[in-house]
Amino acid sequence: MKKIADEIPAYAYGTAAIRPSPVSLEELERLKISAGFTAEDEQFLRMAGEVLAGQTKQIVDHWRGRIIAGIPHLAKHSRTPDGEAIPEYLAQSNLRFEQWILDTCLRPYDQDWLNYQQEIALRHTSLKKNRADGVTSTAFVPFHDIAAFVAVINDTIKSYLAAQGNTAEEVEGMHRAWCRSLQIQIALWSKAYFDVAKTSNEW
């Protein structure tokens, strides 16, 4: 499995530190069906992983430096409550963001992957945000902002999928598979927010 660095702070994929997902593998399979995700999409995601592997830093810099940084209500989630930058936090979370790209494309969607989807979601809610990096920032990232920003991620990723000379058909296939995967991931992340909603409105 490709990793963007030998050491990725607070990246604990597949370890005992990650608790089991409340979503079952059977439910994951049903989500795949609902999203139209097929074995062909798995193949296209593997292709996408190879195409994107050398571009992850550029992609994350694009998302965070050129887009999120210019949207105050999104940028504040990696800053102090007073709006000051936290460079170390940004650097560490950027590495995890890069690795997430590869995990989306190259990891098998098995129990470890399912468990880590729950961990990703929890780290955006008040239950776990800021803990992994030991910082003081916003208490949570509202779910609606995450769900909405997926549209930007899906739109901007396409040019990177096309950057290595693949055919138009291959680029379309990779992009379709990527979008379906993110639809599944957003559905999975919503579970943590629904659970938190019993005590806190983090929509």
Task: Locate the predicted segments by residue.
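Polar/charged alpha-helical tracts
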Residues: 46, 61, 168-169
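Low-complexity, intrinsically disordered or weakly predicted helical/coil tracts enriched
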Residues: 26-42, 80-85
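Short, charged/polar, low-complexity loop and linker segments
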Residues: 35-47, 127-135
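Heme-based O2/NO sensor domains and their adjacent alpha-helical segments
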Residues: 31, 53-160
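Short terminal or interdomain "cap/linker" segment that borders an active site or interface and mediates
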Residues: 1-34, 163-203
